[in-house]
């Protein structure tokens, strides 16, 4: 039981660890700094803006809006620092 919990915790930590941004991901300029283009779910009022995924496929899914986010060097599957984002028109 302890081994299973340790394995699950380790796997969760590896999945959530920061990674290099995908090579096909767009870059943008926000507040004078280079940022990443991210897609946020606009259908979920608060949580959708806080949990955004880095744009990897070139387009956002339906119900998502494109944002330019200053990730501050923290890139991964989920960008929690959506406070530093500007919506792209």
From Swiss-Prot:
Q: Write down the glycosylated positions.
A: 36
Primary localization class, coarse: secreted
User: Which locations, inside or outside the cell, does it occupy?
Assistant: Secreted; Secreted, Cell wall; Vacuole; Cytoplasmic vesicle
Q: Is Translocase a UniProt keyword of this protein?
A: no
Where is the signal peptide, in residue numbers? 1-16
Q: Which cysteines are joined by disulfide bonds?
A: 28-68, 39-60, 40-52, 69-85
Q: What induces it?
A: Under normal conditions on SDAY medium (Sabouraud dextrose agar plus 1% yeast extract), hyd1D is increasingly up-regulated during the period of incubation. Hyd1A is the most active at transcription level under normal culture conditions, followed by hyd1B, hyd1E, hyd2A and hyd2C in order.
Q: What happens when the gene is disrupted?
A: Stimulates conidial germination and virulence via insect hemocoel colonization. Does not affect radial growth and multiple stress responses.
Which keywords does the record carry?
Cell wall, Cytoplasmic vesicle, Disulfide bond, Glycoprotein, Secreted, Signal, Vacuole
Extract the coiled-coil ranges from the record: none
| Tagged with keyword Glycoprotein | yes
Transmembrane portions of the chain: none
The job of this chain, per UniProt, is described as: Aerial growth, conidiation, and dispersal of filamentous fungi in the environment rely upon a capability of their secreting small amphipathic proteins called hydrophobins (HPBs) with low sequence identity. Class I can self-assemble into an outermost layer of rodlet bundles on aerial cell surfaces, conferring cellular hydrophobicity that supports fungal growth, development and dispersal; whereas Class II form highly ordered films at water-air interfaces through intermolecular interactions but contribute nothing to the rodlet structure.
Instruction: Spell out the family assignment given in the record's similarity comment.
Output: Belongs to the fungal hydrophobin family.
Name the record gives this protein: Class I hydrophobin D
* Source species: Beauveria bassiana (strain ARSEF 2860)
Q: By which gene is this protein encoded?
A: hyd1D
